[in-house]
């Protein structure tokens, strides 16, 4: 956007559109202002023919230059066919219709976090993939808005506050011509389905992330199952401490078996049992050990795994962060009732109850405590290495001082002998 039109032409176009300078590059607002000024400056409406011609010329040049910003980089490698100027009237919101906001960001709370590792097919994640594609294949070290339309480039250009960035960014992309984004519309309409092996498994893990998180990317192949393409976590992991500090995740396990024992029902009294299915919230890291299988799932002749039916990919319900941009759609908020301890629980069951209560009803406190505990573990792990480095520097300094003292002593002896002669 900084190389579109000269400075004088920019100021003249904004003057004709009657927009402030900070809105330069906001295509939606500029296009709306252009339509309003076209009605006022049209000769048939009593406007000036010269001003109308100048406005049309500057506006056409602006759109052509923005279109050429991406083309001048040498292509994106997405093999999306570009249209001519006649096909720029179709905006992104018109392309996806009423479900634009759901397809724009499939899982708002996690798509914003997964910057590098994501296999999601929403518009937000696909534009982020284009950013990496442009840097790798086009050797573009610094990208600005216009060359790339990802969230980071948008925030860097407009300096948008974090609280409202998703709402403003969704409206910004909504009015953008779909042809300028180089998006594969088919992949947005038809996201990648999970593999058949995972569909036939008795227990299927669904993550709140839409793809590979930093923690899943560090999973060792020899230390557990490899994460699937749809973002399914491995059963056992060797976690790297920097990844845990930067990207804690939460998972949801769908267990297709008979309901657990009374302990789990006391912990989660608000969960509705439908047929033989129950949703159990889990946390990847906990201060206490995991619940033993014999406590949650006692041996029973009725515990027979049922075949998993074919499921349709559904989009995640919008959270509070994303409700503001939904046009007139009200989503009921499900507030789980507080956990009430019951008499007759063993110390182990009470320990599990307190852990789940802290993890699920105070996630911010739980995340901060887990991060502090992990940070302390990292410091202890690297303390020996720091001690060895300090010892090496100390030995080197002592050796240097001993050599310097020996040289000084040798010079003193030579000077003393020379005086005797």
Curated annotation (Swiss-Prot):
Membrane topology of this protein: Single-pass membrane protein
Modification note: Tyrosine-phosphorylated on three residues 250, 315 and 322, providing docking sites for host Shc1, p85, and Plcg1, respectively.
Stretches assigned to the J domain: 12-75
Listed name of the protein: Middle T antigen
Described purpose of this protein according to its UniProt entry: Plays a role in transformation by modulating the activities of cellular proteins involved in control of cell proliferation and by acting as a functional homolog of an activated tyrosine kinase-associated growth-factor receptor. Recruits upon association with host Ppp2/PP2A the Src tyrosine kinase components Src, Yes and Fyn, thereby activating their kinase activity. Activation of Shc1, Pclg1 and p85 mediate signal transduction pathways leading to cell cycle progression and cell division. MT also plays a role in regulation of early and late gene expression and in viral DNA replication.
Annotated consequence of substituting residue 160 to A: Complete loss of transformation ability
Location within or outside the cell: Host membrane
Start-end of Polar residues biased regions: 215-235
Pfam families, per database record: Papo_T_antigen
Oligomer and partners: Interacts with host Ppp2/PP2A A and C subunits; this interaction alters Ppp2/PP2A substrate specificity and localization. Interacts with host Src, Yes1, and Fyn. Interacts with host Shc1, Plcg1 and p85; these interactions lead to cell cycle progression. Interacts with host 14-3-3 proteins.
Region span, Disordered: 215-237
Primary location recorded for the protein, binned into one broad class: host cell
Modified residues (Phosphoserine): 257
Effect ascribed to mutating residue 248 to H: Complete loss of association with host Shc1
Signal peptide segment: none
Keyword Transmembrane on entry: yes
Transmembrane feature ranges: 395-415
Modified residues (Phosphotyrosine): 250, 315, 322
Keyword vocabulary terms for this entry: Early protein, Host membrane, Host-virus interaction, Membrane, Oncogene, Phosphoprotein, Transmembrane, Transmembrane helix
